[in-house]
Amino acid sequence: MSMSPTVIILACLGFFLDQSVWAHVGGQDKPFCSAWPSAVVPQGGHVTLRCHYRRGFNIFTLYKKDGVPVPELYNRIFWNSFLISPVTPAHAGTYRCRGFHPHSPTEWSAPSNPLVIMVTGLYEKPSLTARPGPTVRAGENVTLSCSSQSSFDIYHLSREGEAHELRLPAVPSINGTFQADFPLGPATHGETYRCFGSFHGSPYEWSDPSDPLPVSVTGNPSSSWPSPTEPSFKTGIARHLHAVIRYSVAIILFTILPFFLLHRWCSKKKDAAVMNQEPAGHRTVNREDSDEQDPQEVTYAQLDHCIFTQRKITGPSQRSKRPSTDTSVCIELPNAEPRALSPAHEHHSQALMGSSRETTALSQTQLASSNVPAAGI
């Protein structure tokens, strides 16, 4: 059993919307949570947490999933944004927000994406160096080393202007420090880097940043940033942009699909009208063909007439001298095919057959009278 293209398109569209577009719990979309100016905040600084929701919810509640609880978040609602100032180590952790409508207090959105806030400045800063040096040729491999006398468990490398960071475990070195080597691969263009240290027990509480390390590249530059060995979190902006693209694709499909279905319906209706008119046309053509004279049929009728005429004028004396065997004359006409005679031709043929039967009966009567002996002679 084959499925029509319309059914297949509707099934694919429903699967796409169910799997890709709607990221929801309880039938509602997720809000989007972000931090401004950055999710990496120095101790004593400030950060604004923002929630965005496309379905009209403009009142939100914010809660912290891990780390030390934040009392000012309890039973608090806010409009679109929430300012944390001054930032303390207790504010480090993962946040989510949920939206609701004031006229429908029981209708809540699904939890937003996780937003991780890192608080820096809690420990002494590490040092950052480059091998083979801070100035390299284009295409030359570069390795950045972050080290400290403190026994950090993890080092975090960030590039200026980038939201994500690279993370590697710290290992003891021969000189008594704890360090991590970040291989960047072939150098492409100059950038400025910093690194931080942290411990397993408090992964969101970082040290002071290292001194900035500018790496300059000589030669033809190109843009590249190595894939993180262990990314700490994904940027929310990229996920939000991806969701917007999927929403746009869904809207375009919903716009095009009705026109496609209307076009198919009109095409089928037009084809049905053409099929209904076609048999009448064939009948007209056949009727016109039957009215035309067929030269082969006329020739056949004239040939039979000549044969019957020849038999009529044959005398009795001649027939008595010949064997009583009728001679049939058959002439094969080229490419002759049996065809139905028109009413006029059929009437003419019946007339000829009747005339032929009368001629044959008269000839037999004359022959019988000539063979009977005269009485009284």
UniProtKB/Swiss-Prot annotation:
Keywords: Cell membrane, Disulfide bond, Endosome, Glycoprotein, Immunoglobulin domain, Membrane, Receptor, Repeat, Signal, Transmembrane, Transmembrane helix. Residues 22-242 are extracellular. The keyword Cytoplasm does not apply. Residues 44-104, 139-202 form the Ig-like C2-type domain. Residues 338-377 are annotated as: Disordered. Residues 1-21 form the signal peptide. Residues 264-377 are cytoplasmic. The chain crosses the membrane at residues 243-263. The keyword Signal applies. One of its GO terms (cellular component) is membrane. It comes from the Eukaryota. GO terms for molecular function: MHC class Ib receptor activity; transmembrane signaling receptor activity. It is found in: Cell membrane; Early endosome membrane. It is a single-pass type I membrane protein. Glycans are attached at N141, N175. Its main location: membrane. Expressed in decidual NK cells and innate lymphoid cell type I (ILC1). Expressed in a subset of peripheral NK cells. Disulfide bonds join C51-C97, C146-C195. PANTHER family: KILLER CELL IMMUNOGLOBULIN-LIKE RECEPTOR 2DL4, MHC CLASS I NK CELL RECEPTOR. Belongs to the immunoglobulin superfamily. Interacts with peptide-bound HLA-G-B2M heterotrimeric complex. Interacts with ARRB2. Receptor for non-classical major histocompatibility class Ib HLA-G molecules. Recognizes HLA-G in complex with B2M/beta-2 microglobulin and a nonamer self-peptide (peptide-bound HLA-G-B2M). In decidual NK cells, binds peptide-bound HLA-G-B2M complex and triggers NK cell senescence-associated secretory phenotype as a molecular switch to promote vascular remodeling and fetal growth in early pregnancy. May play a role in balancing tolerance and antiviral-immunity at maternal-fetal interface by keeping in check the effector functions of NK, CD8+ T cells and B cells. This is Killer cell immunoglobulin-like receptor 2DL4. It comes from Homo sapiens (Human). The gene is KIR2DL4.
